[in-house]
């Protein structure tokens, strides 16, 4: 799908952050593993969350959805699988479920779409083979079989935290206790602690023995509860960058105290010179001169694409470090954003996991044709921010990719002054 984004008027208005996708994944799985009825409120049924709800229904729960909520009734046991578990394009769904699948006592196969089955699973592959379990991955799907055992687990701390969270979901349900030793540096620690916090709401505990070691008591059980998902800082980053550049944007629905690592967007914008205030009504941005800064993306990789847009619109140079994982997402986000930003005159270069963006707002121009969304929701939304921030109408293909995380994105930005045309 092609979409053209341009300014219908000057930028300004109020937008509500959508529910946190990261927290919703975790709440749905904890509810599914709990015997009994849980009610999860403030949900957005993106493709990723729908994939996790569908997987829960296949494995161990009854699921009933409303307009923005879901009742998840955990069965207290796993059911025989008649078909592979479809994870769609959701890396979180797949990586969270692989260890859970090892609790079922059966072979479990997973399928996916897009680049999902190309994304690396070497952490689990090595772990399963070490325990003598079956782990088979191909372009068509992935199959695991065999039961994990309680004990000592060693994982690199600089891999995706999704692997660590996946083990955190499953290990408390084993008969004995386990210890997770994370080889430093530990990146995305906030996502690990988010998993632990959501688990705690459902009655499951773990604790840090030191900054690199997690103790996970065995013999635990998840308990049903009512859970409200807070607003999503990773999605709020898009209107936040727009507000920092143009001013007069207010974002509502974000918790002041949060474990979301992507809340770092506010500190990054502040260091760039952004002016904003936080009140009971939300976070309100004023227009201010912005300058480039040095950004460490290790704990907030999802912010990468929109921060590359921000860098173009700042004075001076922005350097984004520890961004290697961007190359392994729905697209190679570094290469994708480099190509599209250069198409509008942007000055961007990268080497490995380091991205250098030169502020060049005054030399940006309309591209020769449509920009490419690379079937990546964050690329499409970042290019939309670029269009509104610069006043340059941009046509972007693969615009339907937004349904992966924020299906209502284009409608949500209209009150900020956006005009969106579909083709």
Which functions belong to the PLM regions below?
Residues 1-423:
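Short, structured segments at the rim of ligand-binding sites
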